[in-house]
Amino acid sequence: MADHNAHTYFGLRVLEQLPADLLTHVSGDMPAFHLGLYGPDPLIFSLLTKHISDRLHKNWRTESLPGLTKALQKGSATARSFAGGYVLHQLLDDTVHPQIYQWMEEGSSHFRLEIALDLLLLEEKRQANSPKVRTEGKDRTALAAAGMLAPLGARAYLSGLWRMATLSNVFCGPGRPMSAGVRAKEKVQAKELRDRMEAQIAPAARDLEKILVQIPSQADSPRQELLLSRTGRRPAGQQRLADLRRMPAAE
């Protein structure tokens, strides 16, 4: 997705669904987690790297998921956090893109639909301004990303992130140039995308948990057996997530 607010909203909602110990494992570097939520989108903003973004989006389950899984299970705090956010980016795209492509055949715009979804979320949260693209921790995160996402390079990622931040912060958001072009039909369609996104939060948490419970140090522990056999309501990490949001960035 070419804009970022929906991915950030989705990722943080998924974190709230994780048990506290798994939440801690995947959120040790929250700036990296936020950057992971942008997925390969920073690479969209240059003709030199858009083909890499397209490949990473299209083939993420076959080409990227093994490296992401390894990072989630054995990587540093930065690698784990970025990988967690990145997986959630792709899961949300898998949820909404098929519907977006169908509407594109009927005349809607992919870009405008995503802007409409972001604007809808801002309106529902009563936010007057769109949050800026986050760049905290970009250097360490770029190195971690390059280590797990071939053929992505750290320099290309940083360059793309700069373009994404510059263009999004200038042109996107309430009252900005790109927002004015959203059509009435696309605003209605954005509500359906929002509903699809909300419905995917719990399944995405389960998908991420399936990867995390295979952490080697926990592989044969009672904790894993509990997670694998648990039924009913899952422990939530809302308080831990609130604490993480107040913590300074990891260095």
Kindly give the residue locations of the regions a language model identified.
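N-terminal leader/auxiliary helical segments
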Residues: 1-84, 90-251
